[in-house]
From Swiss-Prot:
The lineage of its organism: Archaea, Methanobacteriati, Methanobacteriota, Methanomada group, Methanobacteria. Belongs to the RNase PH family. Rrp42 subfamily. GO terms for biological process: rRNA catabolic process. It holds the Pfam family RNase_PH. It comes from Methanothermobacter thermautotrophicus (strain ATCC 29096 / DSM 1053 / JCM 10044 / NBRC 100330 / Delta H). This is Exosome complex component Rrp42. Its main location: cytoplasm. Keywords: Cytoplasm, Exosome. InterPro entries: ExoRNase_PH_dom1, ExoRNase_PH_dom2, ExoRNase_PH_dom2_sf, Exosome_comp_Rrp42_subfam, PNPase/RNase_PH_dom_sf, Ribosomal_Su5_D2-typ_SF, Rrp42_archaea. The keyword Cytoplasm applies. It comes from the Archaea. CDD domains: RNase_PH_archRRP42. GO terms for cellular component: cytoplasmic exosome (RNase complex).
Length: 271
């Protein structure tokens, strides 16, 4: 496999790196600034919850489909979350049709981990009959435009879609589950959690790398943070190392930025 770093023109790599080492970026942002963000919910009429998020030119649509099914054997009293990501070929020339590749699998796992480990959804409240009937939440992520930093956009879109989701009341009568679609209710949400991704370029770490910056990074770290400021997920990428100071700096910035993102999310979802 050809290393991407080998085919990026040296002049491009050097110009971006020199700017960042001088505390500047090619799109005019500061080192620790997100691109413009927009959030829409209720964008898929056939889904019980959905969202469209744009982070710069990166665009993701997420749909949530609840279904009654069996719990996992080791958690018979808890509902189930299943996450699937589709990297549509129209989103990037590097995305190919066919079964999920390692990037799609990694994206699904990172989003799932951030939602699950943050305990965002109270899965015990999604249990209908312990050991046999629970709500299963199918999360479908569709990347329709890729311009860098899928993780942050995907987590934001997934959280927005979950907050938008309504499920019918489910009652047990004579051992059978009866669904009442006249009583739609929100998911049992404990808290919100979002993610901040950083790229190591030159001597600096930069927040929310664009595609051009991703192409030349030496290392990447994504940090999931709850609204209370607890770390709930972390993912390292790239072939290069990160120093202890790099990681601590990234964590500090993420803990500062996530409450701001959550405030923006809450405002975006207010009717």
């Amino acid at each position: 496999m050809v290393n991407k770093m080998d085919i990026i023109p040296e002049i491009t790599r050097k110009s971006i790196t020199d700017l960042i080492n001088n505390k500047e970026r090619i799109d005019g942002r500061s080192l620790h600034e997100f691109r413009d963000i927009s959030i829409e919910t209720g964008v898929i009429s056939k889904a019980e919850g959905s969202s469209r998020v744009k982070l710069g030119n990166t665009q993701i649509i997420v749909g949530v489909k609840p279904q009654i099914g069996e719990p996992f054997p080791d958690t018979p009293e808890m509902g189930v979350i299943l996450t699937n990501s589709e990297l549509l070929p129209m989103a990037s020339p590097t995305f190919e049709p066919g079964p999920p590749d390692e990037r799609s699998v990694e994206l699904s796992r990172v989003v799932d981990r951030c939602i699950r480990e943050s305990r965002m959804i109270d899965l015990e409240k999604l249990c209908i009959i312990e050991g046999s009937k629970v709500w299963m939440l199918f999360l479908d992520l569709h990347i329709i435009d890729y311009d860098g930093n899928l993780f942050d956009a995907a987590v934001l879109a997934t959280v927005a879609a979950l907050l938008d989701t309504r499920i019918p009341a489910a009652e047990v009568e004579d051992g059978e589950v009866v669904i009442n679609r006249e009583k739609m209710q929100p998911l049992p949400v404990n808290r919100k959690a979002l993610m901040c991704t950083f790229a190591k370029i030159g001597n600096e770490i930069v927040l929310d790398p664009s595609l051009e910056e991703e192409d030349i990074l030496t290392a990447r770290i994504s940090i999931g943070v709850t609204e209370e400021g607890s770390i709930c997920a972390m993912q390292k990428g790239g072939e290069g190392p990160l120093t202890r100071d790099d990681v601590l700096k990234a964590v500090s910035i993420a803990v500062e930025k996530v409450p701001q993102l959550i405030e923006y999310l809450d405002k975006s979802m207010t009717p």
